[in-house]
Amino acid sequence: MVTKAFVLLAIFAEASAKSCAPNKADVILVFCYPKTIITKIPECPYGWEVHQLALGGLCYNGVHEGGYYQFVIPDLSPKNKSYCGTQSEYKPPIYHFYSHIVSNDTTVIVKNQPVNYSFSCTYHSTYLVNQAAFDQRVATVHVKNGSMGTFESQLSLNFYTNAKFSIKKEAPFVLEASEIGSDLFAGVEAKGLSIRFKVVLNSCWATPSADFMYPLQWQLINKGCPTDETVLVHENGRDHRATFQFNAFRFQNIPKLSKVWLHCETFICDSEKLSCPVTCDKRKRLLRDQTGGVLVVELSLRSRGFSSLYSFSDVLHHLIMMLGICAVL
């Protein structure tokens, strides 16, 4: 009887250790907000439970969130840049924040391959009333595990002086009230990936709030195509950069608001497996098999006149870029 008890106990322990089905998708979602960084990875990566994964190798603060394990760095203020092992670097006027999520099991043996999800957020700093305000320009993700190798990609949002998109326009910049209706030129660019991957601009919409789900919205681009004649998409799905232009504007009849936020959802498409170029006379596009990582990039541009989401399935990234142009009229 005692022997049977030990056998049952061993079987129970083994079953408990395999309570989650190993997920072998190399996917990471990174939300880089001005004051907070949120990172998500698919639950049970390579068989690891959430309590076995540590943010910065120090904090076991992951929680289940809609099929993912979520880790939060809640404070990027100068007094707390090292939260849970977060590393920071300041090279004026740029702030870099680095962290990682690693597997860490204290049992006698380990049967799951180790994982290491490293990520960073890069911010362009400005100073208002002696407090640092971050305007993000770049987000970088680096994934490493025991058998699948590594990948690293860098995404950036840039403004340009004209439709040639050859000369970048450094932010922040000032626009006068008389410039409402003038053209603004923007591009979403991916770096660190091979030429087989193309940037595909899916949708862009504007809100009078930094919240991309704000109920009052003005659609600019839908399914890769302009919604009216004031928006022009130059390159979409043909290169490592998607470029477009739109007329500067502001929302009416909204008291005490001087900001308009432009939100753009962008995909990185594997051109060897999918047809990436977007043709606007054929609105139906293949956007299946998207599982994954979201990088949120928020950029605030100050002006005086008005203002203005990457999955990895066989390497398919999904990015949400948020661009805000502050306006004072």
Swiss-Prot record:
GO molecular function list: extracellular matrix structural constituent
Record-linked SMART domains: ZP (SM00241)
Its membrane topology: Lipid-anchor; GPI-anchor
Keywords, ordered alphabetically: Cell membrane, Disulfide bond, Extracellular matrix, Glycoprotein, GPI-anchor, Lipoprotein, Membrane, Secreted, Signal
Compartment(s): Cell membrane; Secreted, Extracellular space, Extracellular matrix
Cysteine-cysteine disulfides: 204-264
Lipidation residue positions, type GPI-anchor amidated glycine: 305
Domain called ZP: residue spans: 19-283
Residues carrying covalently attached carbohydrate according to the record: 80, 104, 116, 145
PROSITE patterns, alphabetized: ZP_1, ZP_2
GO cellular component, one term: extracellular matrix
Propeptide: 306-329
PTM note: The presence of a hydrophobic C-terminus preceded by a potential cleavage site strongly suggests that tectorins are synthesized as glycosylphosphatidylinositol-linked, membrane-bound precursors. Tectorins are targeted to the apical surface of the inner ear epithelia by the lipid and proteolytically released into the extracellular compartment.
Leader sequence residues: 1-17
Main localisation: membrane
InterPro entries recorded: ZP-C, ZP-C_dom, ZP_chr, ZP_dom, ZP_dom_CS
Record text about domains: Zona pellucida domain may enable to form filaments.
Function: One of the major non-collagenous components of the tectorial membrane. The tectorial membrane is an extracellular matrix of the inner ear that covers the neuroepithelium of the cochlea and contacts the stereocilia bundles of specialized sensory hair cells. Sound induces movement of these hair cells relative to the tectorial membrane, deflects the stereocilia and leads to fluctuations in hair-cell membrane potential, transducing sound into electrical signals.
Subunit note: May form homomeric filament after self-association or heteromeric filament after association with alpha-tectorin. Interacts with CEACAM16.
Protein name listed in UniProt: Beta-tectorin
